[in-house]
Amino acid sequence: TADLSGANLSRAGLGKAEVWKANLSGANLQNASCDDADFRWANLNRANLVNARLRGANFSEANLGGADLRGAYLEGANLRGADLRGARLQGANLSLSNITTANCEGTILTGCRVYGMSAWDVHLTEANQTDLIITPAGQPTVRVDNIEVAQFVYLLLHNEKIRGIIDTIGAKGVLILGRFTEERKVVLDAIKVKL
């Protein structure tokens, strides 16, 4: 594995580079072009990736703890299982990325574009997730303050079937608490059939 800790790779062309398991801790990759690069299991702890192009890059299981990814272009990137604790991603484009099972504790995610992001089982304790843009570029901007509800809100806004289901549940849902005699239960069952 390559030891590039502290290396100055600013503006470097690393497209499709295979640097998996490499030590890039503290490295400067500001404005680097790393589209489709393979960073699996790499150590990028406290690395500077400000405004880096990382489209389709694979950071699966990588250590990005404390990394600076402000303004980074991560569209379609794979961050599954990555350690992003304390990372700064203000203004990053995470559209169509996969952050499933990533550790984002204490991560700053303000102003990120998250359209189409896969975010199942993400650890978000104390993460700052405000002004997340859930719409794709070219559509009116809609912002939410929670990654876990971003996709749901987008579907509510753009999918008539989902809206119809929610409306039906709200219109027909009735909560009845208590104990009922057999005669009253018959009446309740009749009401249920009508609804």
Positions of the model-derived regions?
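Tandem repeat scaffolds
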Residues: 1-150
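Conserved N-terminal substructure of TIR/SEFIR domains
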Residues: 148-195
